[in-house]
Every structure is written in structure tokens, then in C-alpha cells.
Design a protein with these regions (language model features):
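Tryptophan-centric aromatic hotspots in well-structured domains and transmembrane helices
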Residues: 12, 54-56, 102
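Substrate-recognition element of Asp-dependent hydrolases with the DxDx(T/V) motif
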Residues: 44-63
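Short helix-terminating capping/connector loops at secondary-structure junctions
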Residues: 43-46, 108-110
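C-terminal cap/substrate-recognition subdomain and adjoining C-terminal extension
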Residues: 62, 66-151
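Short His-Asn-centered micro-motif
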Residues: 5, 52-58, 116-118
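Structural motif
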Residues: 2, 48, 112-114
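Active-site neighborhood of HAD-like aspartate-dependent phosphohydrolases
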Residues: 1-45
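Short, active-site-adjacent cap segments at secondary-structure transitions
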Residues: 11, 57-59, 121-123
Length: 151
């Protein structure tokens, strides 16, 4: 099972009103959100994570896995591709299209997957999606929904 993971609003809730004072602070995941997410993954050792966040446009891949616990970091396998900027306007569900392109590029079109995102409008209504409340981030309810997809 592939998990396409957004970061902002998921592992970093939007409830922080102050501006981060450093890059390290900006990149710090909420410990509760991270624990809920990682604990679900520990119950499903075959699940792999692909980063679908805009972070992939800011940071090289090598920066992201170390932000997770080592046992989870080893299961983060890549980024979704960025689509050609000339064609972006043609896609109603941009993140969904990036997921489909990742699956195509990796010969995984028939692989089961689920996305975790705080903007459900990035995906068609029938998509396998754990929709996150960006104020709370990935919480116990999110963990339950993700577990149902992974079972």
C-alpha cells in the first residue's frame, strides 16, 4: 500500500499563529501528529510513504526522511512528480494527477494507495483519501481512518 502524504496541515497543524523564527522551527513536525501517523504505520509494515507535499518543491528528498523516526524514515520512498507548469491549468485535481503520474512512472498503476491531505479538493470525491482538519492535523480520528484504508 502506498501512502501519499501531505505535510503542512497534516503533520504541521495550521494552529500556529506566530511566524517561525528559523528554518529548523519551520520544519518541526507536531509531535502528537507525528506520533499518531507513525504508530499507524508501525501496524502496517508493508505500507510505504510518498511525499505529495509542496515541500518536495522546496527541499531535496534527503532532507525529509530524517524528520521521521528511523523505522518510518526507511519507508519513505520518494516524491510525487511535479507536473509540467504549462499543463497545470488542465488538471482540476492537481495532487490526484501527480499521484497518478507517480504510479505510472513507477509501474504501480494497480497498486492500492491512499492520500492524506488537508485540502480534499485536490482529489476527486471518490478518491481514497484521509481528509485532515488543518487546525488539528493528523489526530486519533485520522489514525482510525488511515487504519481502515490500510486494513
Amino acid at each position: 500500500m502506498l501512502i501519499f502524504l501531505d505535510i503542512d496541515g497534516v503533520l504541521i497543524p495550521d494552529r500556529r499563529h506566530e511566524t517561525p523564527s528559523s528554518l529548523a522551527e519551520l520544519m518541526k513536525f507536531n509531535s502528537d501528529c507525528l506520533n499518531h501517523f507513525e504508530n499507524v504505520l508501525r501496524s502496517y509494515p508493508n505500507a510505504r510513504v510518498v511525499i505529495s507535499s509542496s515541500w518536495r518543491e522546496i527541499f531535496p528528498f534527503e532532507v525529509i526522511p530524517p524528520l521521521f523516526s528511523p523505522d518510518i524514515a526507511s519507508r519513505i520512498i520518494g516524491f510525487t512528480p511535479s507536473l509540467n507548469p504549462k499543463n497545470i491549468h488542465q488538471h482540476k485535481y492537481l495532487r490526484h494527477q501527480e499521484v497518478l503520474e507517480y504510479l505510472r512512472q513507477n509501474q504501480a498503476e494497480n497498486s492500492p494507495w491512499v492520500a492524506i491531505d488537508d485540502i480534499p479538493e485536490h482529489y476527486p470525491p471518490d478518491s481514497p483519501l484521509v481528509a485532515i482538519d488543518d487546525y488539528n492535523g493528523f489526530d486519533q480520528n485520522s489514525a482510525k481512518v488511515l487504519s481502515e484504508y490500510l486494513t
